[in-house]
């Protein structure tokens, strides 16, 4: 029996996180067998996730605030050593349940895609898991850019990292520079393996659950992020919404209908995409030609709906991956380097630079030019298949480690 703890998860209401957790659990079960696994999830949304992932998880924990994230790595390691000792005594009642689970695990899978960057100003909090003393697998990460203090902390926290795979070449180069002893391997984001809801069901989700008749409409998907406005103070909110709405108007005038995709719906309003999608739809000239997908949907449901579209324009990483994994032409609105790096690996630099741009550069004309370029570039099913094979290697490496 292999005990695996999946950590550093915001929660399944963030459908990008849900896509990661679902893909990881499916990948582990496929590679190792479900009867041979005990899976736990450490999440900031334990009540929701306990129900949402309950069929595949044995336990769900809320992360502990002990030890403090500001403590030096050496001090954190001492705290966890003390907790491990306490687990063998009556003092174990004082050890946080999430800490006890991490200490007992055979392997920790530290997930989150780009959790281990400085973009969200929470690196130290997430890096505590690297000090537990349990082997850690970092699967298909974007790591960095890190501030100087965060980079110093990361380099001082690598002793228990047993496996490091990365999802794009820029991270590979960065880790080979700052921590070559980790021997990073380039794979692909595990969400390339996420199953998509079947087309006929996805169509019903749009038409029945959301009341938008597709008929012979030509569909474009548009994932509008509320969250990036919190992480990028240099973005003008009004311009962001206005230019996206004008782009939708332009598509409508060309015979397209747009499905607005609120891929992240956290309880924290500043990271709930329904608000940004609503603001956009309120500004378009022909709102009834488009739809915001308000109904409850899983990450697989969103992926199935994206598969109905001819093009996806996304400011959320895992909507873009949902499109690329199906060969759907994709435009990336980037708020960090992860989008550009992933697009370059998938499409090649020449194409990626035409269909990827920073959110501060957003305007209706640039959006339309990128959209037309992506459409002309065509579908990419063969590249999608290659990426799925690379994503499978993450779980092959986990199996090889556990069977040593």
Whereabouts are the PLM-identified features?
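Active-site anion-handling motifs in enzyme catalytic cores
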Residues: 1-404
């Amino acid at each position: 029996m292999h005990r695996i703890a999946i950590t550093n998860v915001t929660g399944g209401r963030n459908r990008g996180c849900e896509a990661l957790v679902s893909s990881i659990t499916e990948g582990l079960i496929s590679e190792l067998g479900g009867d041979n696994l005990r899976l736990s999830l450490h999440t900031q949304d334990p009540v929701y996730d306990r129900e949402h992932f309950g069929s595949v998880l044995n336990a769900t924990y809320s992360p502990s605030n002990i030890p403090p994230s500001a403590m030096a790595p050496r001090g954190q390691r001492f705290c966890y050593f003390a907790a491990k000792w306490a687990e063998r005594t009556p003092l174990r009642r004082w050890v946080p349940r999430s800490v006890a689970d991490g200490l007992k695990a055979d392997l920790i899978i530290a997930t989150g895609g780009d959790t281990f960057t400085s973009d969200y100003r929470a690196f130290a909090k997430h890096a505590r898991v690297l000090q537990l003393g349990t082997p850690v697998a970092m699967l298909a990460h974007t790591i960095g850019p890190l501030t100087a203090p965060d980079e110093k902390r990361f380099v001082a926290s690598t002793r228990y990292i047993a496996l490091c795979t990365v999802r794009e070449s820029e991270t590979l180069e960065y880790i080979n520079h700052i921590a070559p002893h980790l021997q990073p391997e380039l794979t692909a984001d595990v969400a390339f393996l996420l199953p998509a809801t079947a087309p006929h069901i996805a169509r019903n989700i749009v038409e029945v659950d959301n009341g938008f008749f597709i008929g012979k409409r030509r569909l474009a998907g548009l994932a509008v992020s509320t969250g990036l406005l919190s992480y990028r103070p240099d973005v003008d909110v009004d311009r962001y919404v206005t230019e996206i709405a004008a782009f939708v108007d332009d598509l409508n005038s060309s015979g397209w209908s747009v499905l607005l995709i609120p891929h992240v719906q956290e309880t924290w309003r500043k990271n709930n995409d329904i608000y940004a999608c609503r603001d956009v739809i309120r500004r378009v000239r022909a709102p009834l030609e488009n739809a915001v997908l308000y109904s409850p949907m899983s990450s697989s449901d969103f992926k199935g709906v994206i598969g109905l579209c001819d093009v996806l324009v996304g400011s959320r990483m895992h909507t873009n991956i949902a499109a690329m994994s199906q060969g759907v032409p994709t435009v990336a609105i980037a708020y960090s380097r992860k989008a550009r790096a992933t697009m370059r690996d998938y499409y090649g630099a020449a194409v990626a630079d035409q269909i990827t741009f920073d959110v501060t550069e957003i305007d209706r004309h640039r959006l339309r030019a990128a959209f037309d370029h992506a459409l002309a570039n065509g579908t990419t099913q063969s590249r999608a298949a290659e990426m799925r094979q690379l994503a499978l290697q993450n779980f092959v490496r986990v199996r090889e480690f556990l069977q040593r």
